[in-house]
From Swiss-Prot:
It comes from Alcanivorax borkumensis (strain ATCC 700651 / DSM 11573 / NCIMB 13689 / SK2). Belongs to the uroporphyrinogen decarboxylase family. InterPro entries: UROD/MetE-like_sf, Uroporphyrinogen_deCO2ase_HemE, Uroporphyrinogen_deCOase. Substrate binds at R29, Q30, A31, G32, R33, D79, Y156, T211, H329. Its main location: cytoplasm. Pfam families: URO-D. It comes from the Bacteria. Catalyzes the decarboxylation of four acetate groups of uroporphyrinogen-III to yield coproporphyrinogen-III. This is Uroporphyrinogen decarboxylase.
Length: 353
């Protein structure tokens, strides 16, 4: 596939810790329910998964935030649970309760029965969306592909949906570690194939979302989450279309383990808001770029407070290469789009070199 040349490579340059004219910015969940035009598209699609599975609609909602704001990257509109769904677990959504699976994975027989999905055929709708979005971007900004981490996917597969304490999976980790490893290895193989297919179809950077890795002890994190993200990083296509394909790891509540994460060979770490970005830069900034890390709840505050927090984070990071501004987690549905605009424009204005 041949695509238009990239006009704005600020995001990719920052990921490689090269100098940029200002700090690039994008937001996790930037195509989402806070935008009225997204809500209209979702209603038109009929359901969230119908929206994900229609390449034209997925493309439309991916581009919506770029029409409103001066963002430096687009991120594929999809869901982290596409892989377990393709494994036959029956993903569905209950209003107000989030994602659920019709089948759970808790026994040796359950794990043995899990197929490794073929990204091109079993997840072809995602690849159609990637190539459609990349074509429609026409070189405006880079396209980010993504996946959930093996550990995070496993939490949903074993618990059957969202969980506060992950008791079934944690019991497996401590009572039957070999069973947990067998499942996580299958997931790591699946994620590697899935992200490589996204890269072949046009993703110019990829992010691994380890939303629940921070729920683990330090030892368990290294053994059951980081180990499998390392396996994925080792197996990814790192050059495509004559350019490096950067990899971002994001473990929510992973601030204690940045050095171990940076040692995986990834290009950048996503940070949540619980860590000072200046401290993070002093710890690992010579190895990786850093992405983050404003508390999404600041977007409910006044415009003046939003600008002040942007300035604080920029000042804390300092005049160094390798910063991509983002929120510390996804933007939430009740945020006023005008407040998101204040945030993004503050980053653009206050970070000009």
């Amino acid at each position: 596939m041949t695509f238009a040349p990239l006009q704005n490579d600020r995001f990719l340059r920052a990921l490689n810790r090269e100098t940029v004219d200002r700090t690039p910015i994008w937001m996790m969940r930037q195509a989402g329910r806070y935008l009225p035009e997204y809500r209209a598209a979702r209603e038109h699609a009929g359901s969230f998964m119908d929206l994900c599975k229609n390449a034209d609609l997925a493309c439309e909602v991916t581009l919506q935030p770029l029409e409103r704001y001066p963002l430096d990257a687009a991120i594929l509109f999809s869901d982290i649970l596409t892989i377990p769904d393709a494994m036959g677990l029956g993903l569905y959504f209950e209003t107000g309760e989030g994602p659920k699976f019709r089948k759970v994975v808790r026994t040796e027989a359950d794990v043995a029965a899990l197929p490794i999905p073929d990204a091109e055929s079993d997840l072809g709708y995602v690849m159609n969306a990637v190539s459609t979005i990349r074509g429609a971007l026409n070189g405006r900004v880079p396209l980010i592909g993504f996946s959930g981490s093996p550990w995070t996917l496993a939490t949903y597969m074993v618990e059957g949906g969202s969980s506060k304490d992950f008791r079934h999976l944690k019991a497996m980790v401590y009572s039957q570690p070999e069973l947990a490893h067998a499942m996580l290895d299958k997931l790591a193989q699946s994620v590697t194939g899935y992200l490589n297919a996204q890269i072949r179809h046009g993703a110019q950077a990829v992010q691994i979302f380890d939303t629940w890795g921070g729920a683990l002890s330090a030892e368990a994190y290294k053994e059951f989450s980081l180990r499998y993200m390392q396996q994925i990083v080792d197996g990814l296509i790192r050059d495509n279309e004559g350019r490096k394909v950067p990899v971002i790891l994001f473990t929510k509540n992973g601030g204690l383990w940045l050095e171990s994460m940076a040692a995986t060979g990834c290009d950048a770490l996503g940070l949540d808001w619980t860590i000072n970005i200046g401290d993070a830069r002093r710890r690992v900034g010579d190895k990786v770029a850093l992405q983050g890390n404003m508390d999404p709840a600041v977007l409910y505050a006044s415009p003046q407070a939003i600008r002040a927090e942007v300035k604080r984070i920029l000042d804390d990071f300092g005049d160094h290469p390798g910063h991509i501004f983002n929120l510390g987690h996804g933007i939430t549905p009740q945020v006023d789009p005008e407040h998101a605009k204040v945030f993004i424009e503050a980053v653009v204005e206050l970070s000009q070199k």
